[in-house]
Amino acid sequence: MQITKTAVAGTLESSDAQVRVAPASTLEIELNSSVGKQFGDDIIATLKDVLNQLDVTAAQIVVEDKGALDCVLRARLKAALLRATDEPINWEKML
């Protein structure tokens, strides 16, 4: 999946996450989390799993996490990525 424009998904409310995606030449992930010291590595692993699932190799990803669950992080990242691309959605990869 090629990222062609900037997109945002999520909120800054408690137990949620805001994900910003922008075009870039390499894959850059920035995590700002209220639970980063405890779960930062797990959050990054979740983000990378979604990026691999959707074949994203170049993008700037900024996550403002407020204690979101794994399923919320996955949903927010997928929503932002789909908003940031002009490619047709491959629904089989979304599962």
Swiss-Prot record:
Mark the transmembrane ranges. Answer: none
Q: What would be one Gene Ontology cellular-component term for the protein?
A: cytoplasm
User: Mind telling me which Pfam families this protein's record contains?
Assistant: ACP
User: Which InterPro entries does the record associate with it?
Assistant: CitD, Mal_deCO2ase/Cit_lyase_ACP
Task: Give the UniProt subcellular location, in the record's own words.
Answer: Cytoplasm
Alphabetized, the UniProt keywords read:
Cytoplasm, Phosphoprotein
Primary location group:
cytoplasm
Q: Does the keyword Phosphoprotein apply?
A: yes
Domain of life (superkingdom):
Bacteria
O-(phosphoribosyl dephospho-coenzyme A)serine PTM positions: 14
**NCBIfam families on file:** citD, PRK13253.1
Similarity remark? Belongs to the CitD family.
Q: What does this protein do?
A: Covalent carrier of the coenzyme of citrate lyase.
What does the subunit comment say?
Answer: Oligomer with a subunit composition of (alpha,beta,gamma)6.
Return the protein name. Answer: Citrate lyase acyl carrier protein
This chain's source organism reads: Actinobacillus succinogenes (strain ATCC 55618 / DSM 22257 / CCUG 43843 / 130Z)
In the UniProt record, the gene name given for this protein reads citD
